[in-house]
């Protein structure tokens, strides 16, 4: 398993309130339980958000997730940048991903 660098951006669509995070928790077919995110080094927020249908997104880094006690693991998904954020409770995840911003990928349409 490849370790994602701390400086990698982590992007998740939606309001990212604790109740939204709670509803989004699931177990990936690989066995990792957490929430789906887009994550990569060297891509812009807009590039990572391009596969996200929501009008708003939350943004953090892998390093911030790890400082809070969680991790981001590369998992298969709809895009090549899909990953699973795991190891944090919904409140902790929400604090990292709020306030949200407008999805720049949707603004370019």
Regions found by a protein language model. Give the residues of each.
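Conserved NAD+-utilizing ADP-ribose enzyme module
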Residues: 1-8, 16-109
């Amino acid at each position: 398993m490849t370790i994602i660098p701390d400086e990698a951006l982590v992007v998740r669509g939606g309001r990212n309130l604790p109740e939204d995070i709670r509803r989004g928790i699931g177990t990936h077919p690989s066995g990792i339980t957490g929430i789906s995110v887009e994550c990569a080094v060297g891509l812009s927020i807009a590039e990572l958000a391009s596969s996200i249908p929501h009008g708003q997104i939350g943004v953090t880094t892998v390093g911030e997730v790890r400082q809070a006690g969680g991790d981001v693991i590369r998992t298969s998904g709809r895009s090549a940048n899909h990953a699973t954020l795991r190891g944090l409770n919904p409140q902790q995840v929400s604090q990292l991903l709020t306030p949200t911003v407008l999805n720049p990928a949707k603004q370019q349409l």
